[in-house]
Amino acid sequence: MNDSTFTLGIVGARGHTGAELIKLVAAHPRLELAFVSSRERAGQRLSDHHPEFQGELQYENLDADAVAAKGVDAVILALPNGLAAPFVAALEAAKPDTVIVDLSADYRFDNSWYYGLPELTRGRYNGQKHISNPGCYATAMQLAVHPLLDLLAGPPQCFGVSGYSGAGTTPSDKNNVELLADNLMPYALTNHVHEREVSVQLGVAVEFMPHVAPHFRGITLTANLWLNRVQTREQIVERFQQAYAGEPLIEVLDEAPWVSRIAGRHGAQVGGFTLAPGGKRVVVVATLDNLLKGAATQAMQNLNLALGIDELTSIPH
């Protein structure tokens, strides 16, 4: 058995997702963390923020050329939208076979990149070195809708609520705990980037209405689906059970999942399956941790896939 190790760098390591990635890498037997780039923490030791990492590795403030000069096997870009391109260009020029996993939305509409939602797109992976990690809401939406794709009579209507960690670490109304207290904050109620992302991936128009809540982590996504033929609840449940059979990170529940029960867990739960009278409308609920299955855990699945390692290595399940 090949037990070679691979070198990895993380760009954007200070954020919530970067912190979760570092925990997963610390538990990985075949990944060596070669560098972590963070402008705000440059010069600080990684072990001071992540005790699971012992040693002298320090955060560095690396531009695209400096990242490329490191010559690592793989790079995870955990940057805000719009910042990935210079890093991708520099890595391609310096070492074209570098595996790049990008967590932003920058390449989710680029067909030359593998769109990595393994439970749904694993069959499309054929050695691509560039992997676009799906959005957190987009992951939940697709898991809730995909098993019923051929039954849809119209656009899925998806009401989403996320914890405020989804708004990142840069201060804004959407992560201001005082403004969020006892509140639910709607935003980007049409044309959200995840609405466009899911519409492209599923090949059907999706209507998505996101909200931010006062809890820190976790997404609940309620999908209202009109069907083109009458279904029983048993038929609906069977579709989901068959779709996610053998997928350790996807749990199909009879009851509607709670976001409080998924926080800190690496998988997703799908359930509820409530049929309206007449059998041609069903409501499905999906939950996941936006920092884990919605970001870091999925990135680790994709990285493992690209490096030829068992997909769930270092992921508790």
Curated annotation (Swiss-Prot):
Enzyme class: oxidoreductase
Compartments, record wording: Cytoplasm
MF (Gene Ontology): N-acetyl-gamma-glutamyl-phosphate reductase activity; NAD binding; NADP+ binding
A GO biological process held by the record: L-arginine biosynthetic process
Record bears the keyword Ubl conjugation: no
TM stretches of this protein: none
Its EC number(s): 1.2.1.38
SMART domains linked: Semialdhyde_dh (SM00859)
Pathways per UniProt: Amino-acid biosynthesis; L-arginine biosynthesis; N(2)-acetyl-L-ornithine from L-glutamate: step 3/4
SUPFAM superfamilies documented for this protein: Glyceraldehyde-3-phosphate dehydrogenase-like, C-terminal domain (SSF55347), NAD(P)-binding Rossmann-fold domains (SSF51735)
Main localization (coarse): cytoplasm
Keyword Cytoplasm: yes
Record keywords: Amino-acid biosynthesis, Arginine biosynthesis, Cytoplasm, NADP, Oxidoreductase
Catalytic activity: N-acetyl-L-glutamate 5-semialdehyde + phosphate + NADP(+) = N-acetyl-L-glutamyl 5-phosphate + NADPH + H(+)
Active site: 136
CC terms in the record's Gene Ontology section: cytoplasm
Family membership noted in the UniProt record: Belongs to the NAGSA dehydrogenase family. Type 1 subfamily.
Function: Catalyzes the NADPH-dependent reduction of N-acetyl-5-glutamyl phosphate to yield N-acetyl-L-glutamate 5-semialdehyde.
HAMAP family the UniProt entry points to: ArgC_type1
NCBIfam families listed in its UniProt record: argC
Protein name, per record: N-acetyl-gamma-glutamyl-phosphate reductase
